[in-house]
């Protein structure tokens, strides 16, 4: 209730009339009138909304207010197990029927149909469903069966045990193990201490089917469920269907009482320090626990104001911590704050400070970050800091508001899911925007915005005794000292007693470009492909643009040029390191005369960004903006060419950050595997080496910046592409000022082959690594040279999808060898035209050879018999659905014009005919006449040094 009282104080401060303001603050906020919401007699809640984007598609969710915290001791892991079983047989869809039914209308398992289980909730989704009457009926029946009609057959349960075990294995990371090992300390006296959703493998491997059924029938019931349907639908008809299909479901007799499980307050601080051999770097968290806003007040102005002030406060404080991290003598590479759930529980929140120390400076880093928190608490965040964070929040709201009539369905779905689970508001975009704008303006006029943010910071961080937790996750490596609990406690005491001075907010009050360049001009205008127009500028640059109304708040910009690393002069390892990393590092170094910190402050409240890259055979820019910030987009683009970052402090900090991230990387098996994959594929070419911590000693600011400038020295070498909602006259004006004005070399570089060659023949790289949790991992790459065409691209893509369907059945469902397995086929063009089939299979170590056999068998079966009509029809439906959706996506058209103008590849015209024309023989012939004719198969297998779990 403290947070409610605080919110009421803020409202009174802003609106003066205390009685009226306080009363209004706790009244329910208006519900979005566009959503049809109701509750059936059996208690099931429904949310239905018509929304036309994506066109002719609908989204179906069923939300359960139950998770692992509802399990008893003999059921640990069964909430998550039950989630899996929803895809393994229901009354109306036995066996694999749920997935098969969805895939028939182009909905892909894992991508469009999925689920998740947490401690407090379980949510199932079927996305991007073509909204025909038949498909809608099917999806509602699936939701019905998930709610009440699972078969839970013993043989299906038995097969799924192994899949769950492999998911546990795959997700067993260093941080996960540390958390698991210390939950009892972090949650004293709480049920959450023994309710991690993955559960205990001893229970997963041995529970009886009746135990699972008991959990299902006890907790999966209408009064704890909600059905959410959003899409291009008739909402009234959907509501009627929901009533028809779900009303007959009854709650169990003598139903179990549903309750939230509290996290008890702790009167003394909790310090936990643990280490793991695979923990890459130290991470220290200080958590100030606090009660969440009571559910009955979450749909109120009091809740929204509290959340808004918290967001502004954390944003401002994070900007300050980031600025501190740029100092060369700062002992941490990064620190930030957040307010959210306390670890895995929703019934306790926490304001959390997270610190990533530089190697060997764990305690000092924690103390310095904690001091900065105390500085903000003692002296307050400044009005200018708060204003920047507030302006940034307003600009984000404006972006959503301006595109309110073209929001895609997932935006609304998340609102309704959280409303059901957490009681949070579901106002219309208009009401939300007007409310936040009105409250913000009133708070600013009353002088209460800064005071409110600082008051909430003080409230959250009031005690380092009661409800205070410090958790340190550290590497377990010889030579790396791990801080003790007492050392961290002493660091907190030192920070609390430190004599601090107020923070000074240094702001560079000048424009990004102090003197506008002499503008150039457009010398030629011509029509291009796909509705684009092309301007040729006086300096030789080309600008392609297309106005769209797909997203009222979006302008996309790309710039592309041939060149890249293929034009670099490399005579040493250091040369190679610096040219490979040039764009990444220089991107951290500010822009123009602005340091990295100054640039962040200057751009606060502006929705515009531009990033540069240098690839193997090209370089370019990628940017986006809202229409009102189009000039800023051009200013940033101009500076990327004429005056890239020169902030050496930021450069050095980034070097230290990378060295810290990679300090213990050799102990992380996944990193060794990544390195082996790239080395095997490219014949151990040093140009694909994954760098380690010591390699960053080669980082040279001057060399990187010089290579960056050389790659971006001449706009005549570039094509610029603009797609979205902009005024053409403004675009023309800005193109002449900021692009045509850049001095040019007057010539275009041509494509040059970088000379990076994949290994040929049959290559098998198998190795072992010491692991804390034994894991197997397989990557197989099959590739070859092959002329590119839309037909070949569609064929190899379909081949990957067919193989995925078969591997899921043979390796996951029938073999229980893996949790995640799949194949991806793609055809590429550039300096080389190739196809590639990429198979990924994290696997049970003892089953690695069996999985490899089945991977090989899948390809041989296609070579012998092709694929079934059903397999191919699923793929066609999925691709055609995505193609239709892409017609109103800016990035799709931007990619088409780039492919056409740079490579003369038309990836659009005739696509539907190509997909519809795909046949089993196409796949069969491709495998026999292309893949097997000259087989290049590269297999990388990593296994544990010991199989002991």
Model-identified regions with their sequence ranges:
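Active-site His/Glu-centered metal-binding helix of metallohydrolases
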Residues: 78-86, 313, 582
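Peptidyl-prolyl cis-trans isomerase
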Residues: 101, 149-152, 156-157, 445-456, ...
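Bacterial Sec-dependent N-terminal signal peptides
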Residues: 1-25
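M16 family metallopeptidases and their MPP-like homologs
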Residues: 49, 54-71, 77-79, 96-145, ...
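Metal-associated gating/positioning segment near the N- to mid-region
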Residues: 85-93
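Hydrophobic, small-residue-rich alpha-helical packing segments that form membrane-like cores
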Residues: 161-169, 174-211, 215-222, 230, ...
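Internal metal/ion-chelating core segments
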Residues: 206-242, 698-731, 735-736
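Proteolytic maturation boundary segments
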Residues: 19-48, 234-308, 313-318, 322, ...
């Amino acid at each position: 209730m403290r947070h409610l009282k605080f919110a009421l104080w803020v409202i009174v401060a802003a609106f003066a009339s205390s009685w009226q303001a306080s009363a209004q603050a706790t009244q329910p906020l208006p519900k979005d009138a566009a959503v049809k919401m109701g509750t059936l007699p059996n208690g099931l809640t429904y949310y239905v909304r018509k929304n036309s984007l994506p066109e002719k598609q609908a989204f179906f969710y069923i939300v359960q207010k139950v998770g692992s915290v509802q399990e008893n001791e003999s059921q640990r892991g069964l909430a998550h197990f039950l989630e899996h079983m929803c895809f393994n047989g229901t009354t109306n869809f036995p066996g694999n029927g749920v997935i098969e039914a969805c895939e028939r209308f182009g909905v892909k398992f894992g991508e469009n149909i999925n689920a998740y289980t947490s401690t407090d909730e379980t949510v199932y989704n079927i996305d991007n469903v073509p909204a025909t009457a038949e498909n809608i009926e099917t999806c509602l029946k699936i939701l019905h069966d998930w709610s009440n009609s699972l078969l839970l057959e013993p043989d299906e349960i038995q097969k799924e045990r192994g899949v769950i075990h492999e998911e546990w294995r795959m997700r067993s990371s260093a941080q996960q193990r540390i958390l698991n090992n210390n939950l009892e300390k972090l949650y004293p006296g709480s049920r959450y201490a023994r309710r991690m959703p993955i559960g205990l493998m001893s229970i997963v491997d041995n529970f009886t089917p009746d135990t699972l059924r008991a959990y299902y029938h006890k907790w999966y019931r209408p009064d704890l469920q909600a059905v959410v349907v959003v899409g291009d639908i008739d909402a009234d008809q959907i509501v009627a269907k929901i009533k028809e299909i779900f009303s007959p479901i009854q709650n169990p007799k003598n139903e179990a009482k549903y309750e939230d499980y509290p996290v008890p307050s702790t009167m003394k601080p909790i310090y936990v320090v643990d280490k793991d051999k695979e923990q890459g770097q130290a991470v220290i968290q200080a958590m100030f626990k606090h009660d969440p806003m009571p559910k009955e007040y979450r749909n109120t102005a009091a809740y929204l104001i509290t959340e808004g002030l918290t967001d502004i406060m954390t944003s401002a404080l994070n900007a300050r911590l980031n600025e501190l991290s740029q100092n060369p003598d700062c002992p941490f590479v990064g620190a930030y704050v957040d307010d959210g759930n306390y670890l895995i529980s929703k019934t306790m929140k926490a304001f959390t400070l997270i610190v990533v120390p530089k190697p060997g400076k764990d305690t000092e880093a924690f103390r310095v970050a904690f001091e900065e928190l105390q500085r903000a608490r003692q002296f307050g965040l400044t009005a200018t800091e708060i204003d920047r964070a507030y302006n940034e929040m307003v600009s984000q709201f404006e972006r959503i508001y301006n595109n309110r009539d073209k929001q895609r369905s997932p935006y609304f779905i998340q609102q309704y899911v959280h409303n059901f689970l957490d009681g949070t508001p579901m106002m219309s975009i208009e009401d939300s925007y007007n409310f936040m704008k009105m409250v913000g303006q009133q708070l600013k006029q009353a002088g209460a915005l800064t005071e409110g943010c600082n008051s909430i910071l003080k409230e959250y961080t009031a005690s380092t005794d009661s409800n205070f937790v410090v958790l340190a996750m550290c590497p377990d490596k010889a030579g790396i000292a791990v801080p003790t609990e007492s050392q961290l406690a002493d660091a907190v005491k030192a920070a609390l007693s430190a004599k601090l001075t107020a923070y000074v907010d240094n702001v560079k009050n000048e424009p990004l470009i102090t003197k506008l360049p002499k503008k150039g001009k457009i010398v030629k205008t011509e029509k291009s492909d796909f509705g684009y127009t092309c301007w040729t500028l006086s300096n030789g640059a080309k600008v392609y643009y297309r106005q769209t109304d797909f997203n009222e708040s979006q302008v996309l910009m790309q710039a592309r040029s041939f060149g890249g690393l293929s034009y670099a002069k490399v005579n040493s390892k250091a040369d190679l390191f610096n040219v490979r990393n040039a764009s990444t590092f220089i991107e951290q170094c500010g822009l123009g005369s602005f340091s990295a910190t100054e640039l962040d402050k200057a751009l606060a409240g502006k929705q515009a960004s531009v990033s540069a890259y240098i690839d193997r055979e090209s370089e370019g820019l990628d940017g986006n903006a809202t229409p009102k910030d189009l000039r800023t987009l051009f200013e940033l683009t101009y500076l990327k060419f004429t005056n890239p970052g020169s902030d050496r402090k930021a450069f050095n900090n980034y070097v230290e950050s990378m060295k810290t991230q990679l300090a213990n990387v050799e102990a992380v098996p996944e990193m060794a595997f990544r390195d082996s994959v790239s080395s095997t594929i490219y014949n151990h070419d040093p140009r694909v080496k994954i760098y380690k911590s010591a390699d960053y000693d080669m980082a040279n600011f001057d060399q990187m910046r010089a290579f960056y400038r050389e790659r971006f020295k001449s706009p005549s070498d570039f094509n610029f592409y603009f797609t979205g909602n902009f005024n053409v006259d403004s675009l023309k004006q800005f193109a002449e000022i900021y692009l045509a004005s850049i001095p040019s070399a007057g010539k275009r570089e041509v494509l040059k082959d970088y000379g990076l060659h994949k290994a040929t023949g049959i290559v098998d790289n198998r190795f072992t690594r010491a692991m804390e949790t034994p894991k197997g991992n397989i990557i197989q790459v099959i590739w070859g040279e092959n002329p590119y065409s839309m037909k070949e691209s569609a064929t190899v893509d379909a081949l990957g999808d067919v193989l995925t369907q078969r591997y899921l059945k043979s390796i996951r469902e029938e073999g229980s060898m893996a949790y995640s397995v799949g194949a991806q086929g793609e055809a590429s063009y550039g300096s080389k035209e190739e196809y590639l089939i990429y198979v990924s299979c994290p696997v049970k170590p003892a089953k690695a050879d069996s999985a490899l056999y089945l991977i090989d068998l899948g390809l041989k079966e296609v070579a012998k018999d092709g694929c079934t009509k059903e397999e191919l029809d699923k793929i066609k439906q999925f691709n055609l659905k995505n193609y239709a959706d892409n017609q109103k996506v800016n990035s799709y058209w931007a990619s088409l014009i780039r492919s056409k103008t740079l490579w003369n590849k038309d990836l659009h015209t005739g696509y539907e005919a190509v997909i519809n024309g795909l046949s089993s023989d196409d796949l069969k012939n491709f495998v026999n006449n292309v893949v097997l004719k000259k087989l290049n198969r590269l297999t990388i297998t990593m296994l544990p040094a010991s199989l002991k779990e």
